[in-house]
Amino acid sequence: MPKIHQLSATLSNQIAAGEVIERPASVVKELVENSIDAQATQIDVLISAAGLQEIRVSDNGIGIAPDDVATAFLRHATSKILTTRDLFNVHSLGFRGEALASIAAVADVKLTTAMDSGIGTQIHVKGGEVEAQSTAAHRRGTDVEVNDLFFNTPARLKYMKSQQTELGKIVDIVSRLAMANPDIAFTVSHDGNMVVRTAGQGDLRQTLAGIYGLSVARSMVDFKAQDLDFRVSGLTSLPETTRASRNYLSLVVNGRYIKNFQLTKAVIAGYGSKLMVGRYPMGVINIEMDAALVDVNVHPTKAEVRLSKEDQLSHLLSEAIRTRLAKENLIPDALDNLPKRERYDLDQLELTLNKISPKTMPSVQPQQGQQLRENTTTNLADTAAEEPTPAPTSPDLEIGDLDDQPIFNEPQRLAAWDQRYQRLASNVVPTLMADEPEPDISHVESAERFPNLTYLAQVHGTYLLAESGDGLYILDQHAAQERVNYEYYRQAIGEVSNDQQHLLVPIVLDYSAADAISIRDHRDVLESVGLYLEDFGQNSFVVEHHPTWFKAGQEEDTIKEMVDWVLRDGRMTVAAFREKTAIMMSCKRAIKANHHLDDRQARALLQKLPECENPFNCPHGRPVLVHFSNTDLEKMFKRIQDSHESGEMQA
């Protein structure tokens, strides 16, 4: 009896569906691409239960002839190509003839189509088998209804994510297709709620506004360039409008949304040093080329392609963006970007002179958050009135409005700071230190291992020189204070209280529909550190208050960065999110390089560093200090030399 046999058509289609149809978003992508190929100008997507229960895609395209309806569900049946030559000269999004057959193999599908308004054709296919076919009244276009996805392959269901995640993927792919086809009007509705709507007027900026929000669309600049083989154009963001991942760059080749690492890298290279580390631009890059220069028959999903002359295209793209940005005034508007009441951050050094356990903090109302922040934070610098509406301070402190003094009057500001320091050190620190908890064993061990340093000097406003009995030490002042700050924030964020600082003007954040869905799905993670985002429209959120440990003047940037983590990393554990937040805040609040410290500030930092659990590295892993032993110094100055005689004897 032969062991090799041919698989049935039904089983073959189910196997093929495993490559083409991975999740509900795959179904939407294939059906919408078919609608685009059918020259539709309006495409509507209706979703129920994130697509697992129902997906319905309707268009006003050219429709399907009655004689071709049943054939369209056969594997490798297509109207897009006919010969081998056509395969290497593809001008349509679909061409493999697998989409309908693969979808019908794992779902219950009903298709209704008409080439002209009036009488059309309806076919019902379930699990790859035709259930019925008949004439039906229908307007011009095609309507495909997909129910009970993966009903006959239940093993696939266990690999599905949450409904919010699956819906986000659907919205993302439709948004990409909308940006690639701004002349087509798209709508996406989920359980009766409109999620995405684009105008279809052919204006790419207008389409971007409908997807990412008006503020992002306004921050885009257009560009275009061409050579003998390629024509590139599109919209890309100014350097100040960035995201934490590359996912907000959409590459479109001959109308097809693709993923290509080298081209994405070329776009980023066009910005040069204008982007901050870890930040990426947003934009839509349209690339037109001869179809013979691109091979789209690489993967069943057609998201990956092979490009001829890829290096040439990358260079053209980088230069086009570099040239366009060079024409822009990239100097930020000081009035728009200047942090509130923070013109000269003399108080950047925030020494932990009074380590507090959050458990010892008094219970306060949200409106008292600023007073708590000023009187009990580990950073004396924060006692300056930095908030738009500062809470009243204790009369005996008499802090004064130092920030309104001229920024060039540094000696007077230093004197005022010293007076304020003395008052705070005598009034605030003793009270707080009385309740300081006993250090744990790890802190004691770190203190014992850390050298007893005597401060000597500062070098280049960046490094501190100190000595001990065993030699010379050089410390990175930014890394050192990062570690001190991190120890505080790790404890403060780990024990979230109800203390909140209200904003005078609430912060409104606009996101794309896909991002808004993801944010709602992970809102509990944000709330675990005291950040509350309330719905404010379809794809917008409002923040009315924030934790008291936020740095004044950087509230919006801090919130956006924390939200970006959620969008980039997805479902993070609360512990991981708090850890990232502590690291971020410790860096934001640490003194930067090229900042002069007086002797008292430097000594205070060296005094506090040994109390850290790990005083040897900053939270990012960089070393805090390096050591030159007495022997090392003596060798460098040739005070210790190898004997010539011993060398000769050894020879």
UniProtKB/Swiss-Prot annotation:
Molecular-function GO term, any one: ATP-dependent DNA damage sensor activity
Source organism, top-level taxon: Bacteria
Keyword Lyase belongs to the record: no
Function: This protein is involved in the repair of mismatches in DNA. It is required for dam-dependent methyl-directed DNA mismatch repair. May act as a 'molecular matchmaker', a protein that promotes the formation of a stable complex between two or more DNA-binding proteins in an ATP-dependent manner without itself being part of a final effector complex.
Organism, as annotated: Lacticaseibacillus casei (strain BL23)
Family: Belongs to the DNA mismatch repair MutL/HexB family.
CDD domains attached to this UniProt entry: HATPase_MutL-MLH-PMS-like (cd16926), MutL_Trans (cd00782)
Region feature Disordered, mapped onto this chain: 383-405
Pfam families registered for this protein in UniProt: DNA_mis_repair, HATPase_c_3, MutL_C
Keywords: DNA damage, DNA repair
HAMAP family assigned to the protein according to its UniProt record, in alphabetical order: DNA_mis_repair
One GO process term, biological-process aspect: mismatch repair
InterPro entries documented for this protein: DNA_mismatch_repair_CS (IPR014762), DNA_mismatch_repair_MutL (IPR020667), DNA_mismatch_S5_2-like (IPR013507), HATPase_C_sf (IPR036890), MutL/Mlh/PMS (IPR002099), MutL/Mlh/Pms-like (IPR038973), MutL_C (IPR014790), MutL_C_dimsub (IPR042120)
Gene Ontology annotations for the cellular component aspect, listed alphabetically: mismatch repair complex
Protein name stated in the entry: DNA mismatch repair protein MutL
Gene coding for it: mutL
